[in-house]
Amino acid sequence: MSIELRRETVQYRDGANELEGFVVTPQSNALRPVVLICHAWRGTEEFDRERAEWIASLGYIGFAIDVYGKGRRGTDNSSCAALMNPFIEDRAFLRRRLLASIACASTMQGADPTRICAIGFCFGGLCALDLARANAPGFVGAIAYHGLFTPPNLGVQSPIQSKVIAYHGWDDPMATPDAVLAFATEMTAARADWQLHALGGTLHAFTNPQANDPSFGVQYRAIAAQRAYQGSEAFFREVFGE
């Protein structure tokens, strides 16, 4: 039996900054968990909206968040880097922006504010991990797909309360074996309940069907994406207590 879904664009703010997200909600009288979808370096695009549809088809609220600001999207590598780098360089700034998305999710109609999870792709994977590091209220799980593992260096990390899982292409040039080991060390030191799934023969951006530039280190790999998504569905059931 198919689930009836409601789709809407939502406006929210981080201080004076206007943000625009996309939400897909299953029609239900019960409160539903929320899964934030954190975009890659281009900003929110059709891929993220499709992920929100997938999340809603599982019975959860899918919320494709906006880190950059309403209407701010990259069109090439240079403009994408210009949008992303200020957040990479100032992780306190990024954390504030991400927590604005948590605040928005917590007050959505039909949302269960005690069961919020985030998934993210590339830069968005770093965002999902930063939400785990922030111990945001009601936050129970983070999934990073081909994410960046650079720690935020915002002082002493308190114990991470949510569960964490990373799906990593072993041949990803943007997350080297040294970075992977540092991530494992960081998560262990933070006493996180964490998992790392390394996928052999897999580059960066392996979930994105539009990624096809091995010389830049990015390439879609359908079997890797399928394995990651199947594992994610089990992870959702675990962290949401189903």
Predicted regions and their residues:
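N-terminal cap/leader regions of alpha/beta-hydrolase-fold enzymes
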Residues: 1-242
